[in-house]
Amino acid sequence: MASTISQTHDKPGRQKLFEWNYDADQEMLCITTEMMTERKYTLDEIRFVLQTLQEQFGAEWFPLANNPALLHDGKERPGLGMVLWKLRRDVKHAQGAVYLGVVLEELGFLEWNRRDAPVGWRVIAAGMDKTMLRLSLTNL
């Protein structure tokens, strides 16, 4: 299974490299950070994230929204991290938004606002079903 190396969006010098690939057997996007921390997102989770962001924001920009203290208290503003937190109520999982956003951008589902602060995206490929996600991830 081929891996892709990508970089988070942040202020110059603070960006982080990470590796990602799609595990077809488990139908899971696997992300490994510079610190060798793994984040895994199922196709159903990714579909839910894209659908929820489309419903909440339409074609408008949404924030990263992955502040650990605010996520833990459930007080983070609506955005990518908060959608992930609602899925599992797991701050570590939700903080992976910084990586997942870049992957979804590289796959053509999101557009980045070209800012290092505040980082944001918008949905540009709405209505993705599980089959379309699988095809996008397997045709890297």
Which residues are covered by each model-predicted region?
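Long Lys/Arg-rich low-complexity intrinsically disordered regions in nucleic-acid-associated proteins
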Residues: N66-A69, D116
